[in-house]
Amino acid sequence: MTTAAKRVVSGMRPTGRLHLGHLVGALQNWEALQRQYDCFYFVADWHALTSHYSNTEAIVADAYDNVADWSAAGIDPAKSTVFVQSLVPEHAELYLLLQMVTPIPWLERVPTYKEQIDQMADRDLSNLGFLGYPLLQTADVIIYNAHYVPVGED
């Protein structure tokens, strides 16, 4: 398999305006990867709902702003597939199937679960969406048969 045939999948949560950290931490890498791989970059709006569910209007607005910023940073829709996660129903379908077969204690043992709860103590994160966040991440990766997944700390 050539590198051009290998697939990269990565997403970004629309939880505010992008800043220099996004450019240096992700977008410069994404821009370079699109020159040699089949790249799928998505607005992770369902991911944003797991912790920012009280302000859905901001998620929608930030999604549009973020995609415009991606374009300014060199993410080219002619070279990469750019999309909004919630507009692809198969994400929800696969996420649901993964929920049906994953024991809750496995999710409670995910190392970042308790760290994230501590870091976002100002929000009520006692919901299935937040607990099942790793399953949504899993669905994002396997639905596109990704070979590489550039990710952040979570």
Give the label of every model feature segment:
Residues 145-153:
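Inter-helical turn/loop segments and adjacent helix faces that build the functional surface
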Residues 2-138:
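N-terminal Rossmann-like or analogous alpha/beta NTP/dinucleotide-binding catalytic cores
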